[in-house]
From Swiss-Prot:
Member of the regulatory pathway controlling female somatic sexual differentiation, regulated by Sxl. Activates dsx female-specific splicing by promoting the formation of a splicing enhancer complex which consists of tra, tra2 and sr proteins. RS domain directs localization of proteins to the speckled subnuclear compartment and the purpose of this localization is to allow colocalization and co-concentration of components of the splicing and splicing regulatory machinery to permit relatively high rates and/or efficiencies of reaction and interaction. This is Female-specific protein transformer. The sexual regulation of tra occurs through a mechanism of sex-specific alternative RNA splicing. The non-sex-specific RNA expressed in males is not translated. The keyword DNA repair does not apply. Its main location: nucleus. GO terms for biological process: cell differentiation; epithelium regeneration; female sex determination; female sex differentiation; mRNA splicing, via spliceosome; regulation of stem cell division. Pfam families: Transformer (PF06495). One of its GO terms (molecular function) is pre-mRNA binding. Residues 1-117 are annotated as: Disordered. One of its GO terms (cellular component) is nuclear speck. Residues 1-18, 25-40 have a biased composition (Basic and acidic residues). The lineage of its organism: Eukaryota, Metazoa, Ecdysozoa, Arthropoda, Hexapoda.
Amino acid sequence: MKMDADSSCGADHRDSHGSRSRSRREREQHGRTSNRDSKKKEHKVPYFADEVREQDRVRRLRKRSPRSTRRSASRSQSSDRRHRHRSRSRNRSRSRSSERRRRQRSPRRYNPPPKIINYYLQVPPQDFYGMSGMQQRFGYQRLPHPPPFPPAPYRFRQRPPFLGAPRFGYRNAWRPPY
C-alpha cells in the first residue's frame, strides 16, 4: 500500500512524526474526542457491569480493525508481499482450467439438443393424393407424368364384410379402424 501525502489510508500513520504533521483543526478535535466518546458511552448499556472488564472488552473490540494493529509499514513487508503474490499467482494458474470449466457450466444446467422424433403414419396412397391424384398446374410446361393413381372405387365406412373380426390387430381394441 503506497502512502502519499493525500491518500486517505495514510491518515492513521501521520502522527509518527510528532504533532508537527497534524493540522491545527485535527489537533483541536483530537483533544475533544475523549469527551465526545464519553458522551456516547453514557447512552449505551454496558455489556459487563464492572467497568474494568467493560473497558477491556471495548479495547479488544477496537483492536480487531486491521489498521490500528500495525502503525508503520514493516521492513519485511515488501519481500513478504512479493512472496504472497507469487504463491497466489501459482495457485491461480493451477486452478484456472477447472475454474473456467465450472464458470462456463454454471449459468444453465446441461440442455440436450431437442430430439427429433419421427412417427411413421401409414396412410393409404389414394387418401394421401386425394381422389384424382396429383393435380397438374396449367400455368407451367407439362412434364410427362405417369398416370395418377386410379381413384379407390369404394370405401366401406365400417369393416368390410369379408374380413373377420381382428384379434386386436388394429390400433386399439376400443378404437375400431374406420
